[in-house]
């Protein structure tokens, strides 16, 4: 059987994969088969971790809000603060509350006091 040299289509496919693997090291950068395996693995990891990142940030925000509410002792816990926020129909998401809790805890204290006064 004669050798068939591959055309530009295969080369284009490999260079596309190579461009994804430009920051890899060693054989993961040089060998075509390793490049395809590692690029697939990287895409799987990035897809999985995009969902995980959302969960992790939400958990971090909840932890920060809970710590701030326990320090000021306005509400016993995070869950009571969130419950009262929903009851009063205040539109503050967890990300905003966590940012307030970290940057200026006194503002979180005043927000929670207002909620408690309205009760």
From Swiss-Prot:
PROSITE patterns: RIBOSOMAL_L20
Disulfide bridge map: none
GO MF entry, a single one: rRNA binding
Main location: plastid
Subcellular localization(s) per the UniProt record: Plastid, Chloroplast
GO cellular component: chloroplast; ribonucleoprotein complex; ribosome
Keywords from the named record: Chloroplast, Plastid, Ribonucleoprotein, Ribosomal protein, RNA-binding, rRNA-binding
Pfam families, per database record: Ribosomal_L20
Its job: Binds directly to 23S ribosomal RNA and is necessary for the in vitro assembly process of the 50S ribosomal subunit. It is not involved in the protein synthesizing functions of that subunit.
Family: Belongs to the bacterial ribosomal protein bL20 family.
Record's protein name: Large ribosomal subunit protein bL20c
Species in which this protein is naturally found: Brachypodium distachyon
Underlying gene: rpl20
